[in-house]
Amino acid sequence: MTGILVAGTSSDAGKSLVVTALCRVARRRGVDVVPFKAQNMSNNSMVCADGSEIGRAQYLQATAAGVTPTSAMNPVLLKPGTDRRSFVVLRGKPGGVLEAGEYTTGRRYLAEAAWAAYDELAASHDMVICEGAGSPAEINLRRGDYTNMGLARAKNLPVVLVGDIDRGGVLASLFGTWALLDDDDRALLAGYIVNKFRGDDAILAPGLEEITDRTGMPSFGVLPWVPGVWLDGEDALEVGRWRHEGDAVDPSSLRVAVVRFPRISNATDVDAMAGETGVDVQVTTNPDTCQAADVLVLPGSRSTVSDLEWLRRSGIADVVARRAEQGRTVVGICGGYQMLCRTILDPDGQETTPGSVVEGLGLLPVEVDFAATKTLALSHGTWRGIEVGGYEIHHGVCRSLEDAEAFLDGVHVGPVWGTMWHGAFEHDEFRRTWLADAARHAGSSWRPHSDELGYQARREAMIETLADALEAHVDVDRILHLVR
């Protein structure tokens, strides 16, 4: 057997979650299924057990499928460092850089690696559910495409098209995608799903019939908006999906502000905080919001130095310094931790000109040295006797310049905390203990609910909810039977 490709009419149409749900439904049916995304462009990544790096979305999909995540499931990961340059992760390891001008011409070696990974999965599993990237109708990118219709043509995959009705114009998006494809690609379109619908889908019926009449594509169903599900996203659009600026906030909530850096990475670190009842997490670029919060988080960054410069221009660096003087909690994770340190050395020019010395915010007695070798590792340790694990994705090597209280692998000075570990806050006891301390420090009455679902249990429940919705509203059997 082989696979199918789930493509979308746009970024954030819902491809990742549809693939997640399909993987879980196939697993329920006893199918040995694996996810695959030839190329992912995302700064939200995860370290596998073998030390390889893949997109968080594919890691989640592997969890839904009940298989061990590997680099074959996301053989090419592009991590944007600037608007014109991406860092390449090839089969889970650093693979150089890709300039914007090379995007359509310099990708043959990436395609070969991606398709070889697909063949590897197809040879060892019953079914491969592939996820496309962006839209398959970007005809300016057709040359060299290996993740959308290029993959479908190469591997003879039927394509399920996902359209997002929540943003409006779904019928035009479905028809427009079909219209822009050539005849060979159209022949691979097996049908479509309308995603994120709110209301009575009977009102859609005439439009769906018209789309089918014009294109020959059948509708596999209308998937409703599923509230309360915010699983690992890959797009910047998805950061903070659980909270929108301006939403009403319970005054008794523990208020957590997360700085939205231009090159924010692994923003999923705060998902677990957002899942706690009574914790209000807001991703923001507003200095006033950062000042008012009980806890301020500086998350990961793919471009630490440029995001540090932005932090200063935005006025948030002044807020961070003021909070430290006032004894108010600030925590930095990976790139955010490095910004809190005294100096950043870049001898090999990882982010700046070789030999540069960049002044940090100076709130932690630590020096950062950007090493040529990238660290990719799963890490384990304790904090106050609590077992904690995390994962590391960084070039920066941190050295303490004087004695400071240890915090996981990092340090803690007064109200300022720093760690290189992503994923630490996914551990329930650690997260709840740390947040409770932060609440007491802020004079907040918030305390964790001991009977509440933990982070991993909550994620599993969300996957099940998605799969249930897919089975209830979409002709899943018809989709799975497309596999030949």
Swiss-Prot record:
Q: Which organism is it from?
A: Cutibacterium acnes (strain DSM 16379 / KPA171202)
- Similarity comment: Belongs to the CobB/CobQ family. CobQ subfamily.
Give the protein name, as stated in the record: Cobyric acid synthase
NCBIfam families documented for this protein = cobQ, PRK00784.1
Pfam families per the UniProt record, alphabetical = CbiA (PF01656), GATase_3 (PF07685)
User: What job does the chain carry out?
Assistant: Catalyzes amidations at positions B, D, E, and G on adenosylcobyrinic A,C-diamide. NH(2) groups are provided by glutamine, and one molecule of ATP is hydrogenolyzed for each amidation.
Q: Which GO terms describe its molecular function?
A: ABC-type vitamin B12 transporter activity; catalytic activity
GO terms of biological process kind: cobalamin biosynthetic process
Q: Residue ranges of the GATase cobBQ-type domain?
A: 253-430
Keywords per UniProt: Cobalamin biosynthesis, Glutamine amidotransferase
Q: Name the catalytic site residues.
A: 334, 422
List all membrane-crossing ranges: none
Pathway field: Cofactor biosynthesis; adenosylcobalamin biosynthesis
